[in-house]
């Protein structure tokens, strides 16, 4: 029997998560929606992949369309989206999935990400179509806007409001506590810096950037994201290459454990196929955010000639997040052979497991721990900025620009507090609110799917874009 309020609350959250992330609800809904859009849009994630690469690398070198006074450039938008996607989910989330769901969880991450590319494409198309300007003249958009403006009626406004509240709590407050805690833990382990000092530094830097608004966030994202991704991927590939003999076994283990979890580490994890699916898809969502309705907020602000030009970058952002950055973490850990168990429990978990893996070659103990802590800082810090921006848009949707300053103060406080607290329970809360965000978003994009299909068909036919052709 639960003996205190905290235990009762924890049990309630776990019960909700068991339903949301069990084998029958969100996993089916997310994968089903991804499959639906994959078929309806003609495997858009495959046939528009080349276009996505061209847009991504063309914008990387040329910085794409000009930002304009009210929005972002195409490159700034995708950089902000990737900044939000590439965070602790790519390090801590990946290792949590490995330990709790076994290596088979990675297979389900891949499946969910492949299908999620089509879902993300649809989200971004709708975010571009239904975007608007707020009372300060900013170009804003996202699920709350395409739910309320696309579906219409009282129920649509209720669903939009529910989504807006869920994302403010999930990303603005709870999610950013998780990111801040990961940074403070990493710096304490690597450099011995007290958590309150890291928390205070984070809070001050975030406050300065928040005050600068969307332009400041976009400028930081477009400068940091390419550097941090290339650095992490480059070092990770070096370690994987040094352990190249282990690659075939690592790949084999992922596929075997997806359908027979006992194939991994003598069954020490105790994971089931259901657990592999749950942790793979849930942690995958926390990482790539496809279907969650978060990254469309960044893409909605992009200044592009046609929504499809931006939507293909949504395909690429999921690809970069899961199939490149997250896979680097997975294969560094698996090929370094640092996973071990004592009495049924993993010896190393979370960020420590990643640090041990990076310590196995090149750096040594001190260098490995320090390198991962620095990478984690940039990953998690840019995620805080991206998630703050997504949540702020929904504050503007619900309460208007007048409420933004109070929201900024609250987020800064939560960032500081998150640096100090143990966040095992907060991870569970994040799973719950992420799940609650998914439901209204997926309902809306499925109902509005004919608009996405028409938009893609018109684009492929070379028809000039006019938003009035798609507004219901």
Please tell me what each predicted stretch does.
Residues 121-131, 135, 237-253, 261, ...:
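Extracellular/periplasmic helix-exit of transmembrane alpha-helices
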Residues 1-88, 98-105, 116, 416-417, ...:
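N-terminal alpha-helical transmembrane segments of multi-pass membrane transport
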Residues 62-100, 126-129, 135-144, 148-150, ...:
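Alpha-helical membrane segments and immediately flanking helix-loop junctions
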Residues 33-38, 112-137, 144, 148-181, ...:
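Helix-loop-helix module between adjacent transmembrane segments
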Residues 44-72, 96, 102-105, 110, ...:
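Flexible loop linkers connecting adjacent transmembrane helices
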Residues 29-33, 40-53, 163, 180-187, ...:
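Membrane-interface loop-to-helix entry segments
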Residues 115-123, 200-214, 225-245, 278, ...:
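Selective recognition of specific alpha-helical transmembrane segments in multi-pass small-molecule
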Residues 8-9, 41-45, 90-94, 171-183, ...:
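Transmembrane helix-loop junctions in multi-pass membrane proteins
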